[in-house]
From Swiss-Prot:
<keyword id="KW-0813">Transport</keyword>
<dbReference type="GO" id="GO:0005344">
    <property type="term" value="F:oxygen carrier activity"/>
</dbReference>
<dbReference type="GO" id="GO:0019825">
    <property type="term" value="F:oxygen binding"/>
</dbReference>
<dbReference type="GO" id="GO:0046872">
    <property type="term" value="F:metal ion binding"/>
</dbReference>
<dbReference type="InterPro" id="IPR050056">
    <property type="entry name" value="Hemoglobin_oxygen_transport"/>
</dbReference>
<dbReference type="GO" id="GO:0042744">
    <property type="term" value="P:hydrogen peroxide catabolic process"/>
</dbReference>
<feature type="binding site">
    <location>
        <position position="60"/>
    </location>
    <ligand>
        <name>O2</name>
    </ligand>
</feature>
<dbReference type="InterPro" id="IPR009050">
    <property type="entry name" value="Globin-like_sf"/>
</dbReference>
<dbReference type="Pfam" id="PF00042">
    <property type="entry name" value="Globin"/>
</dbReference>
<dbReference type="GO" id="GO:0020037">
    <property type="term" value="F:heme binding"/>
</dbReference>
<feature type="binding site" description="proximal binding residue">
    <location>
        <position position="89"/>
    </location>
    <ligand>
        <name>heme b</name>
    </ligand>
</feature>
<dbReference type="GO" id="GO:0004601">
    <property type="term" value="F:peroxidase activity"/>
</dbReference>
<comment type="similarity">
    <text>Belongs to the globin family.</text>
</comment>
<comment type="subunit">
    <text>Heterotetramer of two alpha chains and two beta chains.</text>
</comment>
<protein>
    <recommendedName>
        <fullName>Hemoglobin subunit alpha</fullName>
    </recommendedName>
</protein>
<dbReference type="GO" id="GO:0031838">
    <property type="term" value="C:haptoglobin-hemoglobin complex"/>
</dbReference>
<keyword id="KW-0408">Iron</keyword>
Amino acid sequence: MFKLSGEDKANVKAVWDHVKGHEDAFGHEALGRMFTGIEQTHTYFPDKDLNEGSFALHSHGKKVMGALSNAVAHIDDLEATLVKLSDKHAHDLMVDPAEFPRLAEDILVVLGFHLPAKFTYAVQCSIDKFLHVTMRLCISKYR
């Protein structure tokens, strides 16, 4: 598994300063891209309107990005921070672990699009590593 360096952590925190307070907008767009591009992801929300601009999409986007904001706030103890979320996704929601990397890709796209001046090669690499670590921890309870 990737290990986040001090520089990675600083890069992630610097970018996340621009995400904080806008979790629903960033999350809505990232989830919207995933739901549009990957039809089977709709199965987790059979009774929800997942169209662009829907309340359900904004609400869940805010939850996802809020969880990532919490992870950034506790970046030095990600395993303990994400244990409940991991349990929930593995045992209650039973989300296919293959969906996590897909969402991570869409989050990278959204951050890069909205924060181009901040999204240098090094920052992109740090965010990618952070998302990889968080996603691996979120699927760790699937065993």
